[in-house]
Amino acid sequence: MSGRGKQGGKARAKAKTRSSRAGLQFPVGRVHRLLRKGNYSERVGAGAPVYLAAVLEYLTAEILELAGNAARDNKKTRIIPRHLQLAIRNDEELNKLLGKVTIAQGGVLPNIQAVLLPKKTESHHKAKGK
């Protein structure tokens, strides 16, 4: 026998995505590809797409958490752009980050200037003073 063939060779391990290795849901491979194709720099390190995917996943989870709370407050089970708008504008840090962003169909925050509200009557205070 010539010793060739497939006996005794190591079986190739099952492929594991970089996202699963990092414990992320966002696609590390796709982020890496987009960083390379985007002409941001000549070279892209191995850790950069993992870090960026983790940051994007965290921000998305944070916004969806707050939007889900806004939807629940409005007794709705589906998140709509209005809920995203309320979630972002009511959170100080997210509002600062996304200050210049317009959300389609988001509406505005309910706000009435204090000057426009009806004045409280002070009839009982004057009666006590006399």
Swiss-Prot record:
The modification N6-glutaryllysine is found at K96, K100, K119, K120, K126. There is a cross-link at K14, K16, K120 (Glycyl lysine isopeptide (Lys-Gly) (interchain with G-Cter in ubiquitin)). Residues 7-19 have a biased composition (Basic residues). The modification N5-methylglutamine is found at Q105. Core component of nucleosome. Nucleosomes wrap and compact DNA into chromatin, limiting DNA accessibility to the cellular machineries which require DNA as a template. Histones thereby play a central role in transcription regulation, DNA repair, DNA replication and chromosomal stability. DNA accessibility is regulated via a complex set of post-translational modifications of histones, also called histone code, and nucleosome remodeling. The modification N-acetylserine is found at S2. The nucleosome is a histone octamer containing two molecules each of H2A, H2B, H3 and H4 assembled in one H3-H4 heterotetramer and two H2A-H2B heterodimers. The octamer wraps approximately 147 bp of DNA. It comes from Homo sapiens (Human). One of its GO terms (cellular component) is nucleosome. This is Histone H2A type 1-D.
